């Protein structure tokens, strides 16, 4: 029998059901700025799990939540959503990211926010290129995947 209840997309991070308490705590630490990002060569958050678990919904909430935790202000410049298509190449990804990072951010933190949805659809070369972009201190990257085993180990 089908559930006739309407689907309600989460509106806040508190609406997300996490797979384990450690994941929730990690996200809460990042959002509250207890764990700073970017810091010490870390500028990315990887969200993974099976289809329909809310990875993309959470990814869309995180940039504003992180900005509020850092500056108590909402985003002035919206995050960049990069929906990866099968075979998306390294030069395509890097050209887009570099073009955005070359501009000044008008967010109070000075950071750019990127959501790279279905990052496992990138070619291996594109994933390797992305690793170099993740070394920036001028951006926060939120990556989502259903297939963590298909990602370059450096991501």
PLM feature segments, named:
Residues 11, 40-42, 54, 117, ...:
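Eukaryote-biased feature marking scaffold/signaling PDZ-domain proteins and nuclear chromatin regulators
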Residues 44, 113, 138:
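Beta-strand-rich binding-surface signature
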Residues 33, 98-106, 116-154:
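Conserved catalytic/switch belt of AAA+ P-loop NTPases
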Residues 35-80, 131:
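Walker A/P-loop
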Residues 22, 53, 88, 149-150:
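Short alpha-helical
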Residues 2-50, 98-106:
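Pre-Walker A (pre-P-loop) alpha-helix and adjacent loop at the N terminus of AAA/AAA+ ATPase modules
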Residues 21-24, 75-112:
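Short glycine-rich substrate-engagement loop in P-loop NTPases that contacts/grips substrate
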Residues 16, 27, 47, 56-59, ...:
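Conserved RecA-like P-loop NTPase ATPase core
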């Amino acid at each position: 029998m089908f559930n006739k209840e309407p689907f309600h997309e989460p509106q806040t991070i508190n609406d997300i059901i996490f797979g384990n308490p450690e994941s929730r705590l990690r996200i809460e630490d990042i959002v509250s700025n207890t764990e700073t990002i970017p810091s010490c060569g870390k500028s990315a958050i990887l969200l993974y799990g099976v289809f329909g678990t809310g990875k993309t919904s959470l990814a869309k909430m995180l940039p504003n939540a992180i900005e509020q935790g850092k500056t108590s202000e909402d985003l002035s410049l919206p995050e960049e959503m990069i929906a990866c298509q099968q075979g998306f190449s390294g030069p395509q990804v890097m050209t887009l990211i570099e073009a955005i990072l070359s501009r000044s951010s008008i967010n109070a933190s000075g950071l750019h926010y990127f959501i790279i949805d279905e990052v496992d659809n990138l070619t291996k070369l594109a994933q390797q290129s992305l690793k170099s972009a993740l070394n920036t201190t001028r951006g926060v990257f939120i990556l989502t995947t259903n297939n963590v085993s298909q990602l370059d180990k450096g991501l």
